[in-house]
């Protein structure tokens, strides 16, 4: 005879085992997803030394610009006594304290320590003390503007590298203010063309100015908006800010143009073009403005793309001075974002988002956490770093050995791009 009770028990056991197996699979997948969600990158956080979040946010952003960070990290150590004369020369030339300090050396050590990933957070105290010495305006522990700090940092690095790495590259298209290129100008350097046209005789004047970043106004029709617009309401986008920057404008009466043809000041129009785009396009949204005796913050949410920022509309073709239409060469992807939290220019807090190997991370001083692109897109960006999909670096910008710094030009390793 058939034992129905036995068969029923076996069936229940099989169903329970099957259910347990599915539950275990579900838990395993959840643990795997949680691991990827909360995994730490190889980079470490940066301790806040007392209102130094502005510096930490800039450093974490730059550390995730692969070509820039890789170059600085692979520079030879400048601690060798042979280089002492050059260090003193730079200090005297820039009217520093006279101490043998180099910002590029401390930045190199900081970036190397960041990417060792052996500590949850490292202290940037040595770098900050050098910054105090070479850029006195950042002395003390007051909150500073991240954009101003970034500009001073890059300018100083450019000056030091010009003195330390005197390799011939005057024919490079990435020329800095002094007619020579460094990794700073090769990565961040672009060229603006301003066109001023007299409204009386139509004579046009053109001027070219190098830039390391572009400061964009938030259009007036959006500047009073604080929260993200509801469905159906117009949204301020990064393209709106770029369009405002490059649109034709008539100069005010207080800015009358001295026309060489009319021989007097005349009403005129002005327009900006980007004549040459940088490899890393740094866009600064002007969130602080003066009102009476204080700086107010513009809280407008600005929508920005994470992938595929097409800059062809705003750039001139160098050969024909027409709008560029290069397929893909002027398309950028987001690499990092700096965010200011708070209402005042001299207060609040800075954090940064940056992507590494396809994963986004949030850098909040000592704390580094994984996040998704949607989280990044919801932030109120202050500074955006976009990397060109097709990086173009001159062959002369390569990492050199110690002998190169001492005068013998031996190439040790080209940057991999």
Question: What would you call each of these model-derived segments?
Answer:
Residues 48, 58, 97, 117, ...:
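Hydrophobic alpha-helical scaffolding
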Residues 1-37, 41, 75, 85-89, ...:
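Exposed substrate/partner-binding surface patches
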Residues 41, 45-46, 50, 56, ...:
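Conserved aromatic-histidine-acidic binding/catalytic patches
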Residues 53, 198, 283:
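Carboxylate-rich, divalent-cation-coordinating active-site regions
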Residues 30, 71-210:
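Papain-like cysteine protease catalytic cores
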Residues 46-61, 142-152, 346-349, 384:
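Active-site nucleophilic cysteine motif
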Residues 38-82, 154-157, 161:
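Active-site nucleophile-adjacent alpha helix/oxyanion-hole segment immediately C-terminal to the catalytic cysteine
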Residues 46, 191-194, 252-255:
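Residue-level signal for mature regions of secreted extracellular proteins and peptides
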């Amino acid at each position: 005879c058939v034992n129905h009770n036995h068969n029923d028990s076996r069936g229940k056991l099989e169903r329970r085992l099957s259910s347990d197996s599915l539950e275990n699979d579900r838990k395993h997948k959840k643990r795997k997803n949680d691991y990827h969600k909360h995994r730490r990158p190889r980079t470490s956080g940066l301790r806040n030394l007392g209102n130094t979040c502005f510096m930490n946010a800039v450093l974490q952003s730059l550390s995730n610009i692969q070509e820039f960070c890789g170059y600085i990290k692979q520079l030879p150590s400048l601690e060798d006594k042979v280089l002492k004369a050059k260090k003193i020369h730079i200090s005297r030339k820039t009217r520093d304290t006279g101490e043998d300090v180099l910002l590029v050396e401390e930045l190199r050590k900081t970036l190397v320590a960041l990417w060792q990933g052996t500590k949850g957070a490292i202290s940037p105290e040595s770098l900050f003390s050098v910054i105090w010495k070479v850029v006195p305006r950042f002395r003390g522990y007051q909150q500073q503007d991240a954009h101003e700090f970034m500009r001073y940092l890059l300018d100083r690095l450019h000056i030091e590298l010009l003195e330390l790495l005197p390799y011939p590259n005057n024919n490079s298209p990435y020329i800095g203010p002094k007619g020579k290129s460094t990794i700073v100008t090769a990565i961040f350097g672009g060229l603006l063309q301003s066109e001023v046209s007299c409204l009386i005789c139509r004579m046009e004047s053109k001027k070219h100015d190098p830039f390391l970043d572009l400061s964009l106004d938030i259009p007036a029709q959006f500047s009073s908006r604080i929260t993200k617009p509801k469905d159906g309401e117009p949204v301020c986008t990064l393209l709106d800010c770029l369009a405002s920057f490059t649109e034709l404008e008539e100069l005010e009466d207080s800015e009358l143009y001295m026309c060489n043809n009319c021989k007097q000041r005349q009403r005129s129009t002005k327009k900006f073009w980007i004549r040459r785009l940088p490899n890393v396009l740094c866009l600064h949204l002007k969130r602080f403005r003066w009102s009476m005796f204080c700086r107010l913050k513009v809280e407008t949410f600005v929508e920005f793309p994470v992938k595929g920022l097409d800059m062809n509309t705003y750039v001139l073709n160098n050969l024909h001075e027409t709008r560029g239409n290069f397929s893909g060469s002027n398309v950028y992807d987001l690499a990092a974002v700096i965010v200011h939290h708070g209402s005042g220019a001299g207060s609040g807090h800075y954090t940064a988002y940056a992507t590494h190997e396809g994963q986004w991370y949030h850098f909040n001083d000592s704390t580094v956490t994984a996040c998704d692109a949607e989280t990044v897109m919801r932030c109120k960006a202050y500074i955006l770093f976009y990397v060109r999909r097709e990086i173009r670096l001159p062959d002369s910008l390569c990492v050199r050995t110690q002998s190169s710094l001492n005068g013998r030009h031996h190439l040790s390793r080209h940057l991999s791009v």
